[in-house]
Regions:
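An acidic/histidine-cluster motif and surrounding catalytic segment
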Residues: 1-98, 102-252
Length: 252
C-alpha cells in the first residue's frame, strides 16, 4: 500500500518561512510523502474585522485567563484553514496535520497501522503524535508493541496529529468562534465532541530550537508584577482544566 492511499498530509507554514518548508518537504519526500503546504495565518497582519469574525472578547473572558496574542489567534485560524482545506478539497479519509518545525522519528510506514487503529470508523477521532511530557490514561489500542491511550488530560501543543473526516467537520462546526488557544480548545473534548487519543512514544520530534525558535511570537519586556500575576492565573487555569477533564473522563 502506498503511504498516500489513505492519508492527506498537510504542513502549516508561514509564507516568509521558505527554508522551513524546504526542510520539512525534503524530509517528507524522502519517505515518498507529497504534502500539501498550507499558508499559515500571521495574526499580527490581520485586520480587526477579520479577527472579530472568529475571536471574541466575550468568549475569551469565559474560556481563558488572559487575552490571546495575535500569534495565538493566527495559529487557531491556521488550523481551521487546514481542516477546511481537508473537508473541501481532499477525497482521502484521514488528514495528517504537521507544523513546520517537526520531523518524523523513523519511517512513517511503521506508524500507519497504529494511526488506522485509532481513527478509522465513523466516530470523530483525533490522534496526537507528540507530547512534551508523559501522558497518563487508558490504553485503547496496542499493535506490535505500539500503544495508543485515551489521556486523562489531553496534552498541549499542535505539533502533529492525525484525524478522520468526522473529526474535521466536528471541530469546524463547534469551534467556528473561539476565545482560547487552539491546543487548549482541543483539551476540551467534552465540549467539541471529538475523541482525542495520544500515541505512547512520540512519532515526531519537535525541532523548533534547531531552526531558530518560534517565528510567530512577538516577545515583549513586561513588568515583573504582570508576569507573576499572569503565571499565577495560568497555574490556576491548568489545575481547573485538569480537574474538569478528570471529572468528564470518569463519567464517560
Amino acid at each position: 500500500m502506498n503511504v498516500d492511499d489513505d492519508f492527506e498530509y498537510y504542513v502549516i507554514n508561514l509564507d516568509r518561512s521558505k527554508k522551513r518548508w524546504q526542510r520539512i518537504n525534503k524530509h517528507l519526500q524522502s519517505m515518498s510523502i507529497e504534502a500539501q503546504r498550507v499558508s499559515a495565518v500571521y495574526g499580527a497582519d490581520l485586520p480587526d474585522d477579520e479577527i472579530a469574525r472568529y475571536y471574541t472578547p466575550y468568549l475569551n473572558q469565559k474560556q481563558f485567563f488572559m487575552p490571546l496574542k495575535p500569534a495565538e489567534i493566527g495559529c487557531f485560524m491556521s488550523h481551521r484553514k487546514v481542516l477546511k482545506s481537508f473537508v473541501d478539497l481532499s477525497d482521502k479519509a484521514y488528514a495528517v496535520i504537521l507544523e513546520d518545525d517537526v520531523e518524523f522519528i523513523g519511517d512513517v510506514l511503521e506508524y500507519q497501522q497504529q494511526w488506522l487503529d485509532a481513527v478509522q470508523g465513523e466516530e470523530p477521532v483525533m490522534l496526537k503524535l507528540f507530547s512534551r511530557r508523559q501522558v497518563h490514561g487508558q490504553v485503547v489500542y496496542t499493535h506490535q508493541g505500539r500503544s495508543t491511550i485515551r489521556p486523562h488530560l489531553v496534552p498541549l501543543g499542535t505539533q502533529g496529529a492525525v484525524l478522520n473526516r468526522s473529526a474535521a467537520y466536528q471541530l469546524l462546526n463547534t469551534l467556528s468562534q473561539f476565545g482560547m488557544p487552539v491546543d487548549v480548545a482541543y483539551q476540551h473534548w467534552w465540549q467539541h465532541g471529538v475523541r482525542v487519543l495520544v500515541t505512547v512514544g512520540n512519532h515526531i520530534n519537535e525541532i523548533s530550537a534547531q531552526l531558530g525558535g518560534s517565528n510567530i511570537s512577538n516577545k515583549q519586556n513586561l513588568p515583573l508584577t504582570y508576569k507573576i500575576k499572569r503565571e499565577s492565573k495560568r497555574s490556576w487555569f491548568r489545575l481547573k482544566i485538569k480537574l474538569i477533564s478528570m471529572f468528564y473522563y470518569m463519567k464517560s
